[in-house]
A protein has these predicted regions:
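Active-site-proximal alpha-helix that buttresses catalytic centers in soluble enzyme cores
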Residues: 1-144
Length: 144
């Protein structure tokens, strides 16, 4: 069975976003034994969902996993998944959709690592228990 993976990100004009997604796709491809991996963007810059899906559907695969590369579900994530799933009716490829990233123990480690890095980069010698942290999320207009 040949498998593909599509990461759907919000999109950013920052070149680093694309570079990081390329690295993530490469590593997930190796780790998950995917025949190919691609990424696309919901908005801001191409490749957009239509571009990514059309490219994927040209591949000789049996199954494609779609990963919404967002922390939490919301209106935009639901739109992204719905847009991707529109292509299901025109193909024999089986689509699997994962949940967005959501809560995972590695996120706690990541936040902790960012705090430690910020303290070092700013030459602040406080212990972590003396530091207040404000976490800012994007938010969603989705009532569900």
């Amino acid at each position: 069975m040949k498998r593909g993976l599509m990461l759907i990100d919000r999109g950013s004009r920052e070149r680093e976003a694309e570079e990081e997604l390329e690295i993530i796709c490469k590593k997930v491809k190796e780790k998950g034994n995917y025949d190919f991996t691609e990424f696309c963007f919901l908005e801001v810059v191409p490749p957009f969902i239509e571009d990514g899906m059309e490219k994927c559907l040209k591949k000789d695969i049996d199954e494609m996993t779609i990963v919404p590369y967002f922390l939490y579900p919301g209106k935009k994530v639901k739109i992204a998944v719905a847009d991707a799933m529109k292509y299901q009716k025109d193909t024999k490829i089986k689509f699997l959709v994962s949940k967005p990233m959501t809560m995972h123990r590695t996120l706690v480690d990541l936040v902790d690592s960012r705090i430690v890095s910020a303290l070092k980069e700013n030459e602040i010698s406080l212990s972590k228990d003396k530091v207040d942290v404000l976490v800012i999320g994007h938010g969603s207009m989705d009532p569900n």
